[in-house]
C-alpha cells in the first residue's frame, strides 16, 4: 500500500502538468464566464506559416484573409490555406522579411484597404486589381511603417505608424526603409483624402480599435512599456482625453500589446502577454485566452460573428465564444 501511495504521489505532478498544459483560458473575473463557455477550446487551424498578421473575415465568401510576410493568404473551411495575393511589397526584399501588408480592413464597398508595411503607405486594392494609394506621407515626409488600421463608419481610416524597421534590421543598402520622421504616429485619413496626425507621444503604437459606438478609440503600445490607451473621439473625428486603460508591463508571459478587436458589449480582445487578453471597457483584465504561440492579432468570423480567429507567429487559431464581435 505504501509503495502504491508513493507511486500515486509521484504521478501527481504529471497530472497537474497535463491539466495546466490543457488549460485554454485563465479566468480572473466572473464576468468572463458569460463571454467564454466553460468547455471552450482553442483550435489550431494551420501551422508552418511565415509570420502572420492582420486577419480579416470575408463574409460574402466565408473565409479568412491574413498577411504573411510578403503575401496575403486565405484560409477556407474544409480547404485550408491558399495564396490570395503572392506579393504585396513592390520592391526587392530578402526572403522571409516582413515587408508586405499588415493590418487589413474593408471599405463600405467591400474593397480591401491595407497597411503596406514595406511600401510605407495605406492603399486600397480595387476590383480591377489596380492599387489606389490613400496616403503615403504627412507634411511631405514618408510614413515609417504603417502597422494596423480601423475604419470608421463614415469612411475615415485611422492607423498606427510605428518606427519598426529599425527593429527588423532588414538589409537596406539603398535606404529604402530609412525613416523621414523622428516619431511614431497615429493618423487619420478622412473619406475626402486629408491626412491628419492625431497622436505622436507613443513610443510604439500598434493595434487600434473603436468602441462599438465609435466614441472611444483604443491604441496599443508595445514597448518599452506594454499598455493600452483609450481616447475620446470628438464629433469631428479628432481625439482628446487620452488615458491609460491597462498596463501589463509586469506580466511575465511572452507577447506585447498588438492587434485587437471589440465585441458588441464593448469588451476588448487584445493580443498581448500569454495570448488574447479580454479587457472590460473600464480597463479591467477579465482573463486571458491562452494561445500556444505569441499572438499578433485577431478577427471575428463565421456567420454569427462569435468565432475569434487569432494569428500567432506561424500558426492560425480560433475559439468559439458566447458573444458576437463588431465587424468592419
Describe every region a protein language model picked out.
Residues 1-4:
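Positively charged n-region of N-terminal signal peptides that target proteins for export
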Residues 6-18:
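Bacterial N-terminal signal peptides
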Residues 21-328:
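Sequence-structural signature of mature extracellular/luminal beta-sheet repeat domains
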Amino acid at each position: 500500500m505504501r509503495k502504491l501511495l508513493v507511486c500515486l504521489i509521484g504521478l501527481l505532478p504529471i497530472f497537474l502538468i497535463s491539466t495546466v498544459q490543457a488549460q485554454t483560458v485563465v479566468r480572473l473575473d466572473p464576468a468572463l464566464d458569460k463571454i467564454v463557455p466553460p468547455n471552450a477550446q482553442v483550435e489550431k487551424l494551420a501551422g508552418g506559416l511565415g509570420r502572420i498578421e492582420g486577419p480579416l473575415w470575408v463574409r460574402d465568401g466565408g473565409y479568412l484573409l491574413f498577411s504573411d510576410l510578403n503575401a496575403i493568404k486565405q484560409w477556407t473551411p474544409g480547404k485550408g490555406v491558399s495564396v490570395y495575393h503572392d506579393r504585396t511589397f513592390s520592391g526587392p526584399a530578402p526572403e522571409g522579411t516582413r515587408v508586405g501588408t499588415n493590418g487589413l480592413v474593408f471599405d463600405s464597398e467591400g474593397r480591401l484597404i491595407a497597411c503596406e508595411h514595406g511600401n510605407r503607405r495605406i492603399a486600397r486594392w480595387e476590383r480591377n486589381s489596380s492599387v489606389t494609394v490613400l496616403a503615403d506621407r504627412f507634411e511631405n515626409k514618408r510614413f515609417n511603417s504603417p502597422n494596423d488600421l480601423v475604419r470608421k463608419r463614415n469612411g475615415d481610416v485611422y492607423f498606427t505608424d510605428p518606427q519598426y524597421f529599425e527593429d527588423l534590421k532588414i538589409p537596406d543598402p539603398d535606404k529604402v526603409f530609412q525613416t523621414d520622421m523622428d516619431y511614431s504616429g497615429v493618423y487619420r485619413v478622412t473619406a475626402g483624402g486629408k491626412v491628419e496626425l492625431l497622436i505622436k507621444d507613443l513610443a510604439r503604437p500598434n493595434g487600434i480599435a473603436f468602441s462599438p459606438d465609435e466614441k472611444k478609440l483604443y491604441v496599443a503600445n508595445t514597448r518599452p512599456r506594454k499598455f493600452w490607451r483609450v481616447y475620446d473621439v470628438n464629433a469631428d473625428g479628432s481625439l482628446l482625453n487620452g488615458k491609460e486603460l491597462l498596463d501589463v508591463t509586469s506580466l511575465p508571459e511572452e507577447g506585447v500589446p498588438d492587434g485587437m478587436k471589440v465585441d458588441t458589449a464593448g469588451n476588448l480582445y487584445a493580443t498581448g502577454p500569454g495570448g488574447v487578453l479580454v479587457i472590460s471597457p473600464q480597463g479591467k483584465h477579465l482573463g486571458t485566452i491562452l494561445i500556444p504561440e505569441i499572438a499578433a492579432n485577431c478577427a471575428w468570423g463565421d456567420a454569427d460573428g462569435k468565432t475569434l480567429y487569432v494569428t500567432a507567429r506561424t500558426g492560425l487559431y480560433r475559439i468559439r465564444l458566447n458573444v458576437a464581435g463588431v465587424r468592419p
